[in-house]
């Protein structure tokens, strides 16, 4: 009686918002993907995606997230990885790194 409690959570792990720099890296990835016959890569709405470590430095350096494997059940005991996609993703990432360093 005559007591109260309040709890407040602060979201401190933001999704990576779009910047001119990371959109340029995405444009390069898009071209790499098209050149490899894998189709285009479009940005995903930051409000619909999860957070990433790069989110903390995205305002200070150009970067990209979401180059990893494909599967389902992310970050749960039921997580699966589609191993058939790995070679193509590794090749695409390697070509992206090569082109970014030319």
Enumerate the predicted regions with their spans:
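Metal-dependent amide/peptide-bond hydrolase catalytic core
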Residues: 1-102
